[in-house]
């Protein structure tokens, strides 16, 4: 068994300093019933904790590090730009460069606004949708996470298409009432919602691949159906590609599935590991944003040279071939883990999209939040602890996906499969 004594000590101190001892809830490792592991450094596909333990990393800072940790070109570019200044509160040329690259690769984006987080991007996109259409309501999907903005922290009530209830204390019911929540991958529910509220729905926001219920791809025709319905009612279709952007495909999920939204939210990968967000879309809509239009949005560190540089150097290194390699690595990982899970009688289902992988402890197809919740959470917790002990770092939640990077090697994949074999063998003996 590995020692985590230094992590335990650090966590005890952190609990006196921060709510729950962490700066983001999932990092507390509560769903796997263990104390969090404190990390010290990373290189390539590996991450190292403060006790000196080494892991193959499939968290990758929750997605941004698509090139792996401390990529040489990204690090060198950051060193150079930091010598000139970390932030100016004035425009820089690197903002133009990253914007051009995003516009070139993301089909829906004609104009883009940089911000500092994914939450900021989605909140701004919703304000824009409401301001542009003159409507109030937003339709979202159960289990799709769009950051912690008040109008998006909503769960579904009873019935097929209901007005939301706050999912967190501190979210006023008045705000929640303007959010409609329906099941993911259920077009009929969307149609019913529009029949009832369509004239007041400003936009539909959706993760084109749901990444916060464990990676759930859209079913055939779902995204196109959303496109058709929103066009019929004059609502905006907003793709939240904070997670899927440049992870599903070279041209993002919208390029892969061939459905173009009105607005797109980005983050994670486009910052290369630094805080970032962006939203963009059709010029006629984006030009409503201040200072060219009346809809206000601003940010002190928006477009800061560090994040722009890291994002630019990251995207420059991604090619269409990168995504073919992600598919090959994912194929081998799924094949190997499925084989050993089946041999030990472990229920399991894989969902995948580009470099994103969902692994559930159920034999049932996972197509929405309800089916995702059928996964055996106790089994997941046992698997998580076992894999960590074998040197594989996974997201400490069943409802988060695994991420591949260009730094993951064939040896990493085989070692992960071997670790899973040991863990499943131990679980099956209990």
From Swiss-Prot:
Keywords noted in UniProt = Cytoplasm, Isomerase, Porphyrin biosynthesis, Pyridoxal phosphate
Task: Give the protein's cofactors.
Answer: pyridoxal 5'-phosphate
Which Pfam families does this entry report, sorted A to Z?
Aminotran_3
Classification via InterPro entries: 4pyrrol_synth_GluAld_NH2Trfase, Aminotrans_3, Aminotrans_3_PPA_site, PyrdxlP-dep_Trfase, PyrdxlP-dep_Trfase_major, PyrdxlP-dep_Trfase_small
Show the GO MF annotations. Answer: glutamate-1-semialdehyde 2,1-aminomutase activity; pyridoxal phosphate binding; transaminase activity
Give the organism, scientific name.
Bacillus subtilis (strain 168)
Question: Where is this chain primarily localised?
Answer: cytoplasm
Q: Which residues cross the membrane?
A: none
What this protein is called in its record is: Glutamate-1-semialdehyde 2,1-aminomutase
Enzyme class, broadest EC rank: isomerase
Instruction: Report the subcellular localization.
Output: Cytoplasm
| Annotated metabolic or biological route of this protein | Porphyrin-containing compound metabolism; protoporphyrin-IX biosynthesis; 5-aminolevulinate from L-glutamyl-tRNA(Glu): step 2/2
The record's note on quaternary structure and interaction partners says: Homodimer.
């Amino acid at each position: 068994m590995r020692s985590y004594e230094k992590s335990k000590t650090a966590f005890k101190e952190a609990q006196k300093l921060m709510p729950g001892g962490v700066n983001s809830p999932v990092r507390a490792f509560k769903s796997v019933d263990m104390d969090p592991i404190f990390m010290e450094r990373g290189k390539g596909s590996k991450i190292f904790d403060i006790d000196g333990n080494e892991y193959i990393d499939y968290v990758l800072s929750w997605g941004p590090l698509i090139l792996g940790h401390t990529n040489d070109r990204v690090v060198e570019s950051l060193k150079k730009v930091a010598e000139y200044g970390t932030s100016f509160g004035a425009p820089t040329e690197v903002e133009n460069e990253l914007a051009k690259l995003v516009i070139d690769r993301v089909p829906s984006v004609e104009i883009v606004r940089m911000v500092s987080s994914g939450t900021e991007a989605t909140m701004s996109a919703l304000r824009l949708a409401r301001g542009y259409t003159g409507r109030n309501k937003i339709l979202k999907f159960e289990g799709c996470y769009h950051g912690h903005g008040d109008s998006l922290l909503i769960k579904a009530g009873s019935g097929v298409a209901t007005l939301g209830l706050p999912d967190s204390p501190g979210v006023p019911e008045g705000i929640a009432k303007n959010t409609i929540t329906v099941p993911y991958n259920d077009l009929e529910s969307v149609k019913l919602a529009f029949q009832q509220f369509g004239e007041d729905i400003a936009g539909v926001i959706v993760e084109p691949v749901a990444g916060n219920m464990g990676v759930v791809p859209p079913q055939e025709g779902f995204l196109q159906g959303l496109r058709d319905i929103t066009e019929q009612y004059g609502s905006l279709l907003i793709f939240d590609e904070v997670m899927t952007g440049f992870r599903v495909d070279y041209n993002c999920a919208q390029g892969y599935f061939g459905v173009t939204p009105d607005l797109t939210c980005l983050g994670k990968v486009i910052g290369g590991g630094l805080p970032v967000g962006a939203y963009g879309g059709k010029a006629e809509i984006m030009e409503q944003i201040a200072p060219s239009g009346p809809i206000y949005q601003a940010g002190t560190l928006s477009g800061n040279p560090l994040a722009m540089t890291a994002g630019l150097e990251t995207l420059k290194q991604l090619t269409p071939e990168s995504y073919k390699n992600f598919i090959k690595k994912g194929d081998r990982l799924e094949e190997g883990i499925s084989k050993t899970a089946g041999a030990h009688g472990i229920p399991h289902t894989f969902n995948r999209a580009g470099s994103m992988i969902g692994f559930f402890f159920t034999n049932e197809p996972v197509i929405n939040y309800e089916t995702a919740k059928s996964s055996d959470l106790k089994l997941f917790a046992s698997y998580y602890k076992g894999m960590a002990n074998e040197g594989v770092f996974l997201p400490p939640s069943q409802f988060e996906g695994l991420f591949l990077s260009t730094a993951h090697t064939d040896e990493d994949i085989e070692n992960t499969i071997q670790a899973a074999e040991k863990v499943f063998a131990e679980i099956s003996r209990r």
